[in-house]
Design a protein with these regions (language model features):
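Hydrophobic, aromatic-enriched alpha-helical segments typical of multi-pass transmembrane helices
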Residues: 1-205
Length: 205
């Protein structure tokens, strides 16, 4: 029973990319609401950390699904993206919850961890998608939008581009949500195909 539960969690943990990516994509809207209601974006950024955390858990699930078929470059991409997500989560919590930068104003370690983590995440996401095995768990029609979204994220994270940068930030989150959604659709279609095959076999017998 426990083994089946763990197998189920590993198989479908990748779906957490959907809520994580959606929360990420809604960040500019959250910043706007926070500025409008509280006259500061910090209220939103305090609530941002679940987005990268959910994406991290989803990424781990995706990697576990295809770990036996993935090569070294794809595993490197996974590790780089995972490190980036950990840095983003830690930087956000350190900056807005623990107030680390209030004690180290000059070096601002939490802020720099957050910003560097974004770049590392984008680079790792691109490597992870481009090097994913063709016969892996991720459908090709889900990987292409993910690559585009990761490229948009890399541009957005590199410098402040105002409204255009916010749009690219949204596309990065949409790319992760799309990747998780493609996994769900692929799993549902596979389930329907198995049902049809079993029904046809039962009818013949």
């Amino acid at each position: 029973m426990l083994r089946r539960l763990l197998s189920f969690l590993v198989r479908w943990c990748g779906l957490l990319c959907v809520p994580g990516g959606a929360l990420w994509a809604l960040s500019p809207t959250g910043v706007y609401i926070s500025n409008f209601a509280f006259h500061t974006p910090n209220v939103f950024w305090k609530l941002f950390w679940p987005a990268p955390l959910l994406i991290l858990l989803g990424l781990i699930g995706l990697q576990l699904r295809q770990s036996e078929r993935s090569g070294l470059p794809q595993k490197i991409g996974f590790l780089v993206a995972a490190v980036g997500l950990v840095m983003v989560t830690a930087g956000d919590i350190g900056l807005y919850w623990l107030g680390i930068d209030d004690m180290f104003i000059v070096t601002a370690p939490a802020y720099h961890t957050f910003r560097i983590g974004l770049i590392v995440l984008a680079v790792g996401s691109i490597i992870f998608a481009v090097t994913s095995p063709r016969d892996g768990a991720l459908p090709s029609w889900g990987l292409l939008p993910f690559v585009i979204g990761s490229l948009c994220g890399l541009v957005s994270f590199s410098r402040d581009l105002g409204t255009f940068g916010a749009a690219l930030w949204i596309l990065f989150g949409v790319g992760w949500a799309w990747l998780g959604l493609s996994l769900a659709v692929e799993g549902f279609m596979s389930y329907l195909q198995k049902r049809r095959s079993s029904t046809a076999a039962a009818a013949k017998s």
